[in-house]
Amino acid sequence: MSLLTEVETPIRNGWECKCSDSSDPLVIAASIIGILHLILWILDHLFFKCIYRRLKYGLKRGPSTEGVPESMREEYRQEQQSAVDVDDSHFVNIELE
């Protein structure tokens, strides 16, 4: 008697996936979450430089000038421009009073 006659071979029906026909809400939710995770992962890897640069530098803004007259805004811009002098590749910060 050989070993091949004693081993049961699985029939094709035993290998089929039963998830494809399932309307179980848990399976549907897991599929949606998996697809969204994949999309976000791809977008993150494609655009991470833009996204993190925007988060790092985009949130650092100057003080709000809402309600300030235009003449005072222009004066403030000029003071900010003259506050940093470039001298032989050195930056000098001048505090305004």
UniProtKB/Swiss-Prot annotation:
Pfam families recorded: Flu_M2
Q: Topological domains (Virion surface): residue ranges?
A: 1-22
Quaternary structure and interacting proteins, as annotated: Homotetramer; composed of two disulfide-linked dimers held together by non-covalent interactions. May interact with matrix protein 1.
The record describes its membrane topology as:
Single-pass type III membrane protein
> Which GO cellular component terms are attached?
host cell plasma membrane; membrane; virion membrane
Protein name, entry field: Matrix protein 2
The record comments on the domains as follows:
Cytoplasmic tail plays an important role in virion assembly and morphogenesis.
Q: Where is the lipid attached (S-palmitoyl cysteine)?
A: C50
Q: Does the keyword Cytoplasm apply?
A: no
Entries under InterPro entries matching the protein: Flu_M2
Organism encoding this protein: Influenza A virus (strain A/Seal/Massachusetts/1/1980 H7N7)
Name a GO molecular-function annotation.
proton transmembrane transporter activity
UniProt-annotated site: Seems to be involved in pH gating, residues:
W41
Q: Which GO terms describe its biological process?
A: protein complex oligomerization; symbiont genome entry into host cell via pore formation in plasma membrane; symbiont-mediated suppression of host autophagy
According to its UniProt entry, the function of this protein is described as: Forms a proton-selective ion channel that is necessary for the efficient release of the viral genome during virus entry. After attaching to the cell surface, the virion enters the cell by endocytosis. Acidification of the endosome triggers M2 ion channel activity.
Q: Which residues carry this modification: Phosphoserine?
A: S64, S82
**So which domain of life are we looking at?**
Viruses
Q: Where in the cell is it found?
A: Virion membrane; Host apical cell membrane
Q: Does the keyword Transmembrane apply?
A: yes
* Means of activity regulation: The M2 protein from most influenza A strains is inhibited by amantadine and rimantadine, resulting in viral uncoating incapacity. Emergence of amantadine-resistant variants is usually rapid.
Q: Which family does it belong to?
A: Belongs to the influenza viruses matrix protein M2 family.
